[in-house]
Amino acid sequence: MKRHFFFWPALFLLIAFVTAPLAAQQNAGLVTRLVPSVAQLTIVRGDETPFTVQAVDASGALVHVELRITGPRGLLQIGDGVVTGLEPGEYTINVSVVVPAGSTATPPSLSVPVVVTWPAVDRVVILHAATLYAGTTVTHSARAFNVDGSARPDPDLTWATSDAAVATVDAFGGVSAHAEGTVTIRASFEGVTSQIVHGVVAFPGAALELRGAPDGSVRTGDVVRFEAVVRDASGAILEDAPVNWSHGYTATAGMLGVPATGQMKQGAFVADVPGIHTVTATAGPLSARASFEAKPRDVVQELEIVGHGLEDWYRTTDIWIFEGVDGRDYAITGSKVSGGFAFFYDVTDPSAITKIDSLQVDARTINDVKASPDGRYAVLSREGATNRRDGLVILDMADPRNPRVAALYDEGITGGVHNMFAENDYLYALSNGDKYVIIDVTDIYNPKYLSEYNHPDSRLHDVWVQNGLAYSSEWGTGVVVVDVGDGRWGGSPANPVFVTSYATPTGRTHATFPYYQESTGKTYLFLGDEIMNRRGLAWAGYPRSWGSYQNQYDPETGTGGFPLVTRGFIQIVDFTQPENPEMVARYEMPEFGTHNLWVEDDKLYQSYYEGGLRVVDISGELMGNLYTQGREIAVFKPVSPVGYVANATMVWGTQPFKGHVFFSDTNSGLWSVKLLPRRRPIS
């Protein structure tokens, strides 16, 4: 049954709103050129500068028209008469006249270059380094800080020494001590210098012992931790003796021509490829080594296609699978640019996915759907409502086969809800990418604003809550962690308290999934990028003349009907100590880009857009690139010849549930698959 819910006050507001733009669009044909207030913009990161554009006719007179002004998301913020620089780089603001629907005229347009610069450097700090012994090398590091207190990422430092006879320093801060004496090491960046003074003494080490070598073979991807123990002539351990680590590789049969074979970080080693690996520790004139074999991880499982709920009318967005209050299993999917449709399925039998209902609300897109853990309510996000008060729609799921609208809620979230997170009593909803609002839904017919969290100078895409901590994915800011009930930092749903944040090198944090790993006692954060282009790469995507991946093929123009192209990967942070998070691993497929994810039972279920659904073994300590370690368990790239875009994979969201894996594909709808048990070889 398809049901349509219209909210009449919104329709009257729509008429009042569009009257002025429609009148302005009628003037579009008078415009001959656009005149910007400045020909180009230069902005210091975090600052804003005035920027306006006027439309004029052939005589130079102003024309009242509606303009579309766009810039790169997350890099520039374009407001009412101002532009704010969010990330340093060179960008372009594009401006065009909005023409009436159906017009074939090319609208006047212009492009304005924008350069966002870093604030000036205020200080350089050399981090504490170990004692310098003659005959050893110690790598130094330094950080540069801007006048606003922020750190400059990856500063190109210049290193220098006061006495090359005592110690030299390379371009990367590696200080090699040659003789006893005093030496000053300097680090400079953009005219600011810092220094550290070393007293070089004789190396007292007499013996080096290497501990931690495995007794037998290991698997690729297993982390092996070594310890180097340096002793002096009396047998006492030298705690501050600098140790350098190296790794060698001997190919076994069939393994010639392999890429990087492993990764070494201090005393930790992980093999990427099978073969004989050798780890060597060196301290001054002393060295010790250990050799061992790494065998294939051998985790591949067959994946069986169980069921498919085709959706070819609209582009499918996110999914949520849950057990209803009647004990049966259900799925909800959203849709993009559909006029506000959500779809409801009975998935109790995953091989017979059955659409049982649809619901249309006042929205252009339903990007996200959620249900409470107890199945009491569901919620639909809204973007593009006719009255520009987007908010969300809360559904009473007392009868899961007949969802009822319990409430429309928009307090504090009128500017567009892109993502949400549902708990039994609280609902977390994004507000126009600026903040998230916490709503008391104890009574779903009377939801109440409780509190909100808005991280300074940051834009967010998603929020996920686990064990009283809210993890918001905030693009260049990275992941922001807030206490909303954990209590260790004094937070609660009514009083969110900031805990920490962690920025990734790519600056495109789109989704976060926290995971506690029982075997190691570690808590990992899986941070997913979203980068909707491949500019600058060898495979850069399809030409613009082909149209948009979002459109079905148009035989008249020959455009549309092709897959999207993306990039980006999963970055894995050890969050066991929240005050000291550390990036330790990644899962990167170079040809594709990541979207939503789920982690459960030592498996990563990754929606990899055009790379399909990918299931990855994340057992044991994690280090290096999981993709090159043979940790992929299964991959499936769904296609449908009758999909919204035929035979074009675009996996959006995934969720394991009761032994099956459900996922949504933008072009083909809802799918269910199952990992089959590994078969023992027949001898």
Predicted segments with their positions:
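Bacterial N-terminal signal peptides that target proteins for export
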Residues: M1-A10
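Feature marking well-ordered beta-strand scaffolds used for ligand recognition
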Residues: M255, D272-S683
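Bacterial N-terminal signal peptides
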Residues: P9-T19
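Extracytoplasmic soluble-region selector
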Residues: A24-V300
